[in-house]
Amino acid sequence: VTSNLYESKEYSDIREVIKDGINRYPDCVAFTIKNKEGKDIQYTDITYAEFEKEINSLGTGLLKLGLKDKKIAIIGPNSYEWVLSYISVLFGIGIVVPLDKGLPAQEIEDSIIRSDADALIFDPKYIDIIEDIKQRSTTKVKEFICMKEVESKEINNIPKIKKIGKEELDKGNKEFFELKIEPEKTSIILFTSGTTSLS
């Protein structure tokens, strides 16, 4: 009898899983991004190899901001920037805290406080809520990072951080590549759908 089973492969962490996919399919499309401006719609493909470069740039940039071993919350609808941020943090930077995109403003603030987040990466649609939270200084967040470019001196953004990271990589900075992932160490804090600020 001929076996149709595939040979399994064991991984020790999420970084190995992602890296394996990148090495196997570097030129294959990993993401297709839909860009809409008015009635004009364009699609941009990102290969696995390009995704790896983006992870390395963002990860190195986040480390340059002093976020090693810090808690980094992320909020926003499904997007390439959300996935990029999430994976970059899981590559050994610190603890990722994904927040429900449907939370009301007060619950967003409460979740940030409860998770003790040091940084917050957010979609532009939350800019008003985030600026309000920032003004009140109720959280310990030191880095507010928008997923897109914004006109604000007080709020950072992913394109800017990726640029800083790439410059560091070009200088030979290997800190991001040398990060160790400890299997028993907390890497994610999840709030379930039933979690409230009081539970």
Which functions belong to the PLM regions below?
Residues 1-16, 34-35:
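Flexible, non-catalytic linker and terminal segments flanking ANL/adenylate-forming cores
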Residues 56-60, 113-116, 197:
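Solvent-exposed alpha-helix faces
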Residues 72, 89, 120, 186, ...:
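Conserved S/T- and glycine-rich ATP-binding loop of Class I adenylate-forming
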Residues 26-29, 146, 163-191, 198:
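Conserved pre-ATP/AMP-binding loop-to-beta segment of ANL
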Residues 91-164, 177:
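Structural core segment of the AMP-binding/adenylate-forming
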Residues 10, 27-87, 104-109, 165-168:
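Conserved AMP-binding/adenylate-forming core of the ANL superfamily
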